Amino acid sequence: MAGVDKAMVTLSNGVKMPQFGLGVWQSPAGEVTENAVKWALCAGYRHIDTAAIYKNEESVGAGLRASGVPREDVFITTKLWNTEQGYESTLAAFEESRQKLGVDYIDLYLIHWPRGKDILSKEGKKYLDSWRAFEQLYKEKKVRAIGVSNFHIHHLEDVLAMCTVTPMVNQVELHPLNNQADLRAFCDAKQIKVEAWSPLGQGKLLSNPILSAIGAKYNKTAAQVILRWNIQKNLITIPKSVHRERIEENADIFDFELGAEDVMSIDALNTNSRYGPDPDEAQF
């Protein structure tokens, strides 16, 4: 799709990160995920987002190799799962993910959630121990950028109070019903890029009459309107699909621009509603 490979954001360390990517949450390991990654890369995507807990890192790597797109042209994100938080366990988990992906380095490594069943260690919050390991991986150039996922402002403040390397990305649930305005403002002030997971509200927003009406103005679907809204908000966005037609359709958003009134109408849909768990309450 024209333009999808050109849309970039610049992280605080100068690394260019593709603004639009493919998420593979709930994509089953094997041929399904491998094909989805291959189709996305062949359609111009240059950013794939996975995680250790998705159990499909090997399939992502296989899809990358099958696509024929050079490794250096693809931005790969993966994430540390909660049970592996802690300094030494983080280092080991990173290496396991790297080997499963079959790559020499990872572009972006994220702490998946700030809490789990065992949030505390002797030294304090486990995600702070993990962040020290993230900084070590970054200094050793095993990863090009480091960040967090599902962090509220108070979680970020904990990290910022102790870090020597500031998180470059915060990936959170973000869509028109939960636009995270306060968190986005905080992250902007700290030069932390915000990335939207579940940008389509797990598909529940696709029948919204306001979004559908806006789409009709531009001859676009409600999904394309939402994703274009993400782009115009300078958000990184990673819609998920395993269907070739939908993968291509999702990326067909770089040939139009939402008018200011339409952006305001989408902004006004916010009700701070979540489809996923609140990070302060999640117990995985």
Swiss-Prot record:
Record-listed substrate binding positions: 112
One GO BP: prostaglandin biosynthetic process
EC number(s) per entry: 1.1.1.-
Coiled-coil portions: none
Active site: 54
Domain of life: Eukaryota
Subcellular location: Cytoplasm
Pathway note: Lipid metabolism; prostaglandin biosynthesis
Positions bound to NADP(+): 24-25, 49, 149-150, 171, 197-202, 240-242, 246-250
NADP keyword on record: yes
EC category name: oxidoreductase
Keywords: Cytoplasm, Fatty acid biosynthesis, Fatty acid metabolism, Lipid biosynthesis, Lipid metabolism, NADP, Nucleotide-binding, Oxidoreductase, Prostaglandin biosynthesis, Prostaglandin metabolism
Reaction catalyzed: prostaglandin F2alpha + NADP(+) = prostaglandin H2 + NADPH + H(+)
UniProt site positions, description: Lowers pKa of active site Tyr: 79
UniProt-recorded Gene Ontology molecular function terms: aldo-keto reductase (NADPH) activity; nucleotide binding
Gene3D superfamilies, A to Z: NADP-dependent oxidoreductase domain (3.20.20.100)
InterPro entries xrefs: AKR, AKR5A, Aldo/ket_reductase_CS, NADP_OxRdtase_dom, NADP_OxRdtase_dom_sf
GO cellular component entries: cytoplasm
Family named by the database record: Belongs to the aldo/keto reductase family.
Task performed by this protein: Catalyzes the NADP-dependent formation of prostaglandin F2-alpha from prostaglandin H2. Also has aldo/ketoreductase activity toward the synthetic substrates 9,10-phenanthrenequinone and p-nitrobenzaldehyde.
Record note on quaternary structure: Monomer.
Protein name in UniProt: 9,11-endoperoxide prostaglandin H2 reductase
Species assigned in the record: Leishmania major
